[in-house]
C-alpha cells in the first residue's frame, strides 16, 4: 500500500477512534520490506497511536530495529515456525531461520520493547516444539504464541 493510501486509512479511523483505545499492528506480507516503514511508524505515533509489527526478521538489522523504535514502535512479534529445516522450508528462504533467530537475539537486548515469538504449528513442526521451547528460552524469550494454521498449501504438508 502506498504511503499516501496508508495515511488516508489511518486518518479515516482517527476521526472516530480514541488513539488510547487502539494499538496499531503492521503486518504481512513483510513490513520490513517497506522503505518507508519508519515514516509510517512516525505518522502512527504523531496521531497518538501506539504501534507495533509482526515480521519474519529477514530484513531486521540492529540499525533498522533502533530506527523503528525511534519511530515509536513499542512492540514486535517475530515469526518462527520451526527449527532451521522446517522454518526455511515453510518460508522458502535458506537464511530465514538464521535471520529470525538473529532478530530475536537483537530484540531481547532491548528491555523496553515488548515482544513475542509466534509459531504456526504444522505436521512438520509439531515434533520440534520441545526443542523450539529450549531454543527460545536460551535466547531470552519470555512470550511464545503457538497456534495452529489452516492446512492449505505448504501448511498442509
Language-model-detected regions and their locations in the chain:
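Radical SAM/AdoMet-radical enzyme domain recognition
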Residues: 3-26, 34-151
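Nucleotide-sugar-dependent glycosyltransferase catalytic core
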Residues: 155-157
Amino acid at each position: 500500500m502506498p504511503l499516501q493510501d496508508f495515511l488516508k486509512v489511518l486518518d479515516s479511523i482517527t476521526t472516530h477512534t480514541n488513539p488510547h483505545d487502539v494499538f496499531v499492528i503492521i503486518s504481512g506480507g513483510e513490513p520490513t520490506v517497506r522503505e518507508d516503514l519508519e515514516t509510517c511508524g512516525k505518522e502512527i505515533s504523531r496521531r497518538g497511536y501506539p504501534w507495533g509489527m509482526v515480521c519474519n526478521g529477514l530484513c531486521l538489522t540492529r540499525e533498522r530495529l533502533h530506527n523503528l523504535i525511534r519511530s515509536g514502535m513499542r512492540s514486535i512479534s517475530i515469526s518462527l515456525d520451526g527449527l532451521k529445516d522446517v522454518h526455511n522450508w515453510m518460508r522458502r528462504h535458506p537464511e530465514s531461520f538464521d535471520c529470525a533467530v538473529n532478530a530475536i537475539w537483537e530484540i531481547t537486548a532491548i528491555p523496553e520493547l515488548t515482544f513475542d515469538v509466534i509459531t504456526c504449528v504444522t505436521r512438520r513442526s509439531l515434533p520440534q516444539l520441545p526443542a523450539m521451547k529450549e531454543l527460545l528460552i536460551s535466547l531470552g524469550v519470555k512470550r511464545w504464541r503457538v497456534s495452529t494454521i489452516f492446512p492449505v498449501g505448504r501448511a498442509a504438508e
